[in-house]
Amino acid sequence: MARQQEPRKPFKSRPNPLDAAEITYIDYKDTDLLRRFVSDRGKIRGRRVTRISARQQRQVAAAIKNAREMALLPYTGSPAGT
């Protein structure tokens, strides 16, 4: 016998956080903004998680990499003990 499918939950759209804050230029020196797009392990979060467009994702990734190179952001996350 086939299992009955449960009805799907309605899709809940979340707005683009950069468009909502009216941010047009992503600066590598704005570490507070960039930290929102980096996981606690230091990985750059994906588009599905952050809800930003493909172009914005490329700009954020480039800004994070520049900030890491300039030692404004760490390459890895903070240690678990701190």
From Swiss-Prot:
Keywords: Ribonucleoprotein, Ribosomal protein, RNA-binding, rRNA-binding. Binds as a heterodimer with protein bS6 to the central domain of the 16S rRNA, where it helps stabilize the platform of the 30S subunit. It comes from the Bacteria. One of its GO terms (biological process) is translation. The gene is rpsR1. The keyword Transmembrane does not apply. This is Small ribosomal subunit protein bS18A. InterPro entries: Ribosomal_bS18 (IPR001648), Ribosomal_bS18_CS (IPR018275), Ribosomal_bS18_sf (IPR036870).
